[in-house]
C-alpha cells in the first residue's frame, strides 16, 4: 500500500509540474513572448497530461484502503475545482478592463486557488500520515 501511495504522490508532483508549465505559458502569452497558436498547443499538452495523471491516480486508487480511497476522491475533486478556478481566473484576466467588479472577482478566484492549494496539501499530508 505504501508503494501505491508513493505512486500517487509522484503523480501529484507531475500534476504540479504541469500547472507550472501552464502558468509559465500564460505569463509568456501575456508578455507576448508566445502567440496564441503556441499557447493552444501548450494548453492541449497540459490538458492531456492532467487527464493522464488523473487516470493514473484513479487506477492506483483501486488497491487502497477505504480511508485512502476517500482521500484520493477528495484530492481529485479539489484538483478539478482548482483547474476550473484557474481557467476562470485566466479568462477574466484576458478580458479584464480593471473594473472594480472584475478586480473583486479576480481577487476572489485568487483566494479560492490559494485555499484549494492548502486543502490539497493537507490531503496529501493526510495520505502520507495514513501509511
Curated annotation (Swiss-Prot):
Disulphide bridges: none
Annotated TM spans: none
Classification via Pfam families: DNA_repr_REX1B (PF14966)
Localization annotation: Cytoplasm; Nucleus
Gene Ontology CC: one annotated term: chromosome, telomeric region
UniProt KW Nucleus keyword: yes
InterPro entries found in the cross-reference section: REX1-B
GO biological process: pericentric heterochromatin formation; subtelomeric heterochromatin formation
Highest taxon of the lineage: Eukaryota
Keyword annotations: Cytoplasm, Nucleus
Described purpose of this protein according to its UniProt entry: Required for heterochromatin silencing within pericentromeric repeats and at telomers. Facilitates the recruitment of Clr6 histone deacetylase (HDAC) by interacting with histones. Also interacts with Rad25, which mediates heterochromatin silencing in DNA repeats by recruiting the RITS complex. Together with Rad25, forms a regulatory hub that defines heterochromatin silencing within tandem repeats via linking RNAi and HDAC.
Oligomeric form and interacting partners: Monomer.
PANTHER family: REQUIRED FOR EXCISION 1-B DOMAIN-CONTAINING PROTEIN
Protein name: Heterochromatin silencing protein rss1
Organism, as annotated: Schizosaccharomyces pombe (strain 972 / ATCC 24843)
Amino acid at each position: 500500500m505504501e508503494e501505491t501511495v508513493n505512486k500517487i504522490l509522484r503523480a501529484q508532483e507531475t500534476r504540479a509540474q504541469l500547472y507550472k508549465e501552464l502558468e509559465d505559458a500564460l505569463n509568456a502569452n501575456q508578455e507576448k513572448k508566445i502567440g496564441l497558436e503556441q499557447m493552444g498547443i501548450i494548453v492541449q499538452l497540459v490538458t492531456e497530461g492532467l487527464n493522464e495523471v488523473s487516470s493514473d491516480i484513479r487506477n492506483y486508487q483501486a488497491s487502497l484502503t477505504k480511508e485512502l480511497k476517500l482521500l484520493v476522491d477528495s484530492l481529485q475533486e479539489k484538483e478539478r475545482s482548482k483547474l476550473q478556478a484557474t481557467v476562470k481566473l485566466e479568462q477574466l484576466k484576458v478580458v479584464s478592463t480593471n473594473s472594480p467588479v472584475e478586480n473583486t472577482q479576480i481577487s476572489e478566484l485568487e483566494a479560492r486557488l490559494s485555499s484549494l492549494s492548502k486543502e490539497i496539501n493537507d490531503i496529501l499530508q493526510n495520505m502520507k500520515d495514513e501509511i
